[in-house]
Amino acid sequence: MYAIGDKVVCPMHGAGVIEQIETRSINDTDQQYYVVSLFLGNIKIMVPVAKESTQIRTVTHKEHAREILNALHDLETEQNSNWSKRYRENMDKLKTGDLIETAKVFKSLVLRNKEKTLSAGERKMLHSAKQILMSELMIALDTEFADLERDIYNAIG
Protein backbone atom coordinates (compact mmCIF):
# COMPACT_ATOMS: atom_id res chain seq x y z
CA MET A 1 0.00 0.00 0.00
CA TYR A 2 1.19 3.47 -0.82
CA ALA A 3 1.31 6.31 1.70
CA ILE A 4 0.51 10.01 1.60
CA GLY A 5 3.43 11.82 -0.01
CA ASP A 6 4.51 8.90 -2.21
CA LYS A 7 5.31 9.80 -5.81
CA VAL A 8 3.54 7.52 -8.26
CA VAL A 9 2.75 7.18 -11.97
CA CYS A 10 -0.77 6.75 -13.28
CA PRO A 11 -0.77 5.28 -16.81
CA MET A 12 -2.49 7.62 -19.28
CA HIS A 13 -2.08 10.54 -16.84
CA GLY A 14 1.55 10.81 -15.73
CA ALA A 15 3.37 11.26 -12.45
CA GLY A 16 1.92 12.74 -9.30
CA VAL A 17 1.95 12.63 -5.54
CA ILE A 18 -0.55 10.92 -3.26
CA GLU A 19 -2.18 13.80 -1.37
CA GLN A 20 -4.58 11.77 0.69
CA ILE A 21 -6.29 8.44 1.11
CA GLU A 22 -10.02 8.75 1.55
CA THR A 23 -12.99 6.47 1.91
CA ARG A 24 -15.99 6.89 -0.38
CA SER A 25 -19.28 5.06 -0.21
CA ILE A 26 -20.41 3.77 -3.59
CA ASN A 27 -23.53 1.61 -3.82
CA ASP A 28 -23.51 1.19 -0.03
CA THR A 29 -19.96 -0.18 -0.16
CA ASP A 30 -17.07 1.73 1.40
CA GLN A 31 -13.95 1.85 -0.75
CA GLN A 32 -10.62 3.53 -0.14
CA TYR A 33 -9.13 5.76 -2.82
CA TYR A 34 -5.78 7.38 -3.36
CA VAL A 35 -6.16 11.04 -4.29
CA VAL A 36 -3.27 11.71 -6.68
CA SER A 37 -2.33 15.27 -7.61
CA LEU A 38 -0.59 15.19 -10.99
CA PHE A 39 2.58 17.24 -11.43
CA LEU A 40 1.63 18.59 -14.85
CA GLY A 41 -1.82 19.84 -15.66
CA ASN A 42 -3.12 20.74 -12.17
CA ILE A 43 -5.38 17.66 -12.14
CA LYS A 44 -6.38 15.35 -9.30
CA ILE A 45 -7.49 11.79 -9.91
CA MET A 46 -8.83 9.12 -7.61
CA VAL A 47 -7.48 5.58 -7.82
CA PRO A 48 -9.13 2.70 -5.94
CA VAL A 49 -6.70 1.25 -3.40
CA ALA A 50 -8.01 -2.20 -4.34
CA LYS A 51 -6.75 -1.69 -7.90
CA GLU A 52 -3.40 -0.10 -7.10
CA SER A 53 -1.40 -2.89 -8.72
CA THR A 54 -2.92 -2.18 -12.14
CA GLN A 55 -3.60 1.54 -11.95
CA ILE A 56 -0.52 3.09 -10.34
CA ARG A 57 3.16 2.29 -9.94
CA THR A 58 6.19 3.88 -8.35
CA VAL A 59 8.24 6.42 -10.29
CA THR A 60 11.21 4.88 -12.09
CA HIS A 61 14.63 5.29 -10.49
CA LYS A 62 17.13 7.92 -11.62
CA GLU A 63 19.47 5.50 -13.41
CA HIS A 64 16.66 4.00 -15.49
CA ALA A 65 15.39 7.47 -16.40
CA ARG A 66 18.89 8.46 -17.56
CA GLU A 67 19.15 5.27 -19.63
CA ILE A 68 15.87 6.08 -21.37
CA LEU A 69 16.90 9.67 -22.05
CA ASN A 70 20.27 8.53 -23.41
CA ALA A 71 18.68 5.80 -25.54
CA LEU A 72 15.89 7.98 -26.93
CA HIS A 73 17.80 8.66 -30.13
CA ASP A 74 18.21 4.94 -30.82
CA LEU A 75 14.72 3.78 -29.80
CA GLU A 76 13.09 1.96 -32.69
CA THR A 77 9.71 3.30 -33.69
CA GLU A 78 7.29 1.70 -36.09
CA GLN A 79 4.99 3.76 -38.27
CA ASN A 80 1.93 1.96 -39.54
CA SER A 81 0.68 3.79 -42.62
CA ASN A 82 -2.96 3.15 -41.67
CA TRP A 83 -4.02 5.98 -39.36
CA SER A 84 -6.54 4.00 -37.31
CA LYS A 85 -4.19 1.05 -36.78
CA ARG A 86 -1.31 3.38 -35.88
CA TYR A 87 -3.52 5.27 -33.42
CA ARG A 88 -4.77 2.04 -31.80
CA GLU A 89 -1.23 0.63 -31.52
CA ASN A 90 0.04 3.84 -29.93
CA MET A 91 -2.91 3.97 -27.53
CA ASP A 92 -2.25 0.38 -26.47
CA LYS A 93 1.39 1.27 -25.78
CA LEU A 94 0.38 4.27 -23.65
CA LYS A 95 -2.11 2.18 -21.67
CA THR A 96 0.66 -0.17 -20.54
CA GLY A 97 2.15 2.61 -18.43
CA ASP A 98 5.61 1.45 -19.48
CA LEU A 99 8.01 4.39 -19.70
CA ILE A 100 9.92 2.98 -22.69
CA GLU A 101 6.70 2.37 -24.63
CA THR A 102 5.57 5.92 -23.82
CA ALA A 103 8.92 7.26 -25.05
CA LYS A 104 8.51 5.29 -28.29
CA VAL A 105 5.03 6.74 -28.87
CA PHE A 106 6.27 10.26 -28.16
CA LYS A 107 9.27 9.89 -30.46
CA SER A 108 7.26 8.37 -33.31
CA LEU A 109 4.68 11.17 -33.15
CA VAL A 110 7.34 13.89 -32.98
CA LEU A 111 9.06 12.43 -36.05
CA ARG A 112 5.76 11.99 -37.89
CA ASN A 113 4.84 15.60 -37.08
CA LYS A 114 8.10 16.73 -38.72
CA GLU A 115 7.13 14.87 -41.90
CA LYS A 116 3.51 15.96 -42.11
CA THR A 117 0.80 17.55 -40.00
CA LEU A 118 -0.71 15.24 -37.42
CA SER A 119 -4.44 14.63 -37.24
CA ALA A 120 -6.30 16.16 -34.29
CA GLY A 121 -6.36 12.77 -32.54
CA GLU A 122 -2.63 12.25 -32.96
CA ARG A 123 -1.88 15.82 -31.84
CA LYS A 124 -3.81 15.12 -28.65
CA MET A 125 -1.98 11.82 -28.23
CA LEU A 126 1.38 13.57 -28.74
CA HIS A 127 0.46 16.06 -26.02
CA SER A 128 -0.60 13.25 -23.66
CA ALA A 129 2.53 11.18 -24.34
CA LYS A 130 4.68 14.25 -23.70
CA GLN A 131 2.90 14.99 -20.40
CA ILE A 132 3.24 11.38 -19.24
CA LEU A 133 6.90 11.10 -20.26
CA MET A 134 7.96 14.52 -19.02
CA SER A 135 6.23 14.27 -15.64
CA GLU A 136 7.93 11.00 -14.74
CA LEU A 137 11.37 11.95 -16.04
CA MET A 138 11.19 15.32 -14.25
CA ILE A 139 10.64 13.58 -10.94
CA ALA A 140 13.12 10.75 -11.52
CA LEU A 141 15.88 13.09 -12.72
CA ASP A 142 14.95 15.96 -10.37
CA THR A 143 15.08 18.52 -13.17
CA GLU A 144 13.05 21.42 -14.51
CA PHE A 145 10.50 21.10 -17.33
CA ALA A 146 12.32 23.42 -19.77
CA ASP A 147 15.69 21.72 -19.29
CA LEU A 148 14.23 18.25 -19.72
CA GLU A 149 12.18 19.29 -22.75
CA ARG A 150 15.33 20.62 -24.44
CA ASP A 151 17.24 17.42 -23.61
CA ILE A 152 14.46 15.19 -24.96
CA TYR A 153 14.12 17.03 -28.26
CA ASN A 154 17.92 17.09 -28.66
CA ALA A 155 18.03 13.34 -28.03
CA ILE A 156 15.37 12.68 -30.67
CA GLY A 157 17.30 14.75 -33.18
Residues of each region from the PLM?
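Charge/polar-rich, low-complexity and marginally structured segments
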Residues: A50-G157
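A positional/architectural concept
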Residues: M1-Q55
